[in-house]
Regions:
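Metal-dependent polysaccharide deacetylase catalytic core of the NodB/CE4 family, i.e.
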Residues: 31-38, 79-80, 99-187, 212-220
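Membrane-proximal basic amphipathic "stem/tether" segments
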Residues: 1-35, 40-41, 45, 217-241
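C-terminal domain-boundary segment and adjacent tail
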Residues: 46-77, 166, 192-213, 224
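Short, function-defining helix-loop hinge/capping sites that tune catalysis or transport
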Residues: 93-94, 147, 226
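Short, well-ordered alpha-helical microsegments
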Residues: 90-93, 184-188
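Generic detector of well-ordered alpha-helical packing
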Residues: 11, 86-87, 140
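Aromatic/hydrophobic pocket-lining residues that form the small-molecule binding cavity
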Residues: 54, 91, 154, 158
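Active-site beta->alpha N-cap acidic-glycine motif
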Residues: 27, 39, 45-48, 53, ...
Length: 241
């Protein structure tokens, strides 16, 4: 059944790409990763990827694309940026690989999980922030959905996470990603009030100078993705869903 679903997905993706996306493939494609070997509860989707597979993917990307920051739209060609959500402890393993290839990355950290078992420590986060190609951003306090919160709860999540991380890295933080890709009409106004300049969501697509700063598109990479799947996601085969 799973194989059949993949075949159907790929057929639809091929048709979508060739009719809608082939001539729109300019800009930055940001990829989302989460965990790198950690066994996560209820991970039926496969967001925890084998670290060796991640290494192979980074080598492939570095060999075939220009790698840039998530908010760098200066190239006239397709560029790739890497983002990592949540802040699991095994993020350190992924960052060692990114650093070896000199690949820029953005790390979005759930501030309420810092120092907990299985998550990055304050020392980890500070050390990561000192890497030349790193950007540190917030990912809420609790990893709950913003669209399920009232205004004051959202404000507190975005403010507290910002202050906690700024205190750790001793630098201004102006970027966030929405937990579960969830936000509502209040969220962007709160971001502006708190001094955020960028926010990443879960909408798929290319980013450019015309992209809303608070709706940066990202495409999720999961454990079952092959290099072909990775390439197709970059091209936009699956942007239709």
């Amino acid at each position: 059944m799973r194989k059949t679903k993949h075949i159907i997905r790929d057929i639809i993706g091929y048709c979508y790409y060739n009719t809608m996306k082939r001539f729109q493939n300019i800009g930055n494609r940001c990829l989302i990763y989460h965990a790198f070997g950690t066994r996560l509860k209820h991970d039926s989707y496969g967001i925890s990827i084998n670290i060796n597979k991640f290494k192979d993917q980074m080598k492939f990307l570095n060999d075939h694309y220009k790698m840039t920051d998530i908010n760098d739209f200066s190239s006239d060609d397709v560029t790739i940026s890497i983002s990592i959500d949540d802040g699991y402890k095994d993020t350190n393993d992924a960052i060692n690989i990114l650093n070896n290839y000199n690949i820029p990355f953005t790390l979005f950290i759930t501030a309420g999980k810092i120092n907990q078992k299985g998550y990055l420590s304050e020392t980890d986060i500070y050390n990561i922030s000192q890497i030349k190609n790193s950007i540190i951003g917030t990912h809420g306090m609790s990893h709950n959905r913003f669209e399920k919160m009232n205004y004051s709860s959202q404000f507190k999540e975005l403010k507290d996470s910002k202050l906690i991380l700024q205190n750790i890295i001793k630098e201004e933080i102006n970027i966030t990603s929405y937990p579960h890709g969830s936000f509502d009409k209040n969220t962007t106004g709160i971001l502006s009030k708190l001094g955020y300049k960028w926010a990443a969501c879960s909408k798929k697509g290319f980013n450019s100078f015309s992209t809303d700063n608070f709706l940066l598109c990202r495409s999720e990479i999961i454990a079952s993705d092959t290099i072909i799947d990775l390439t197709n996601k970059i091209k936009g085969y699956y942007d239709y869903y």
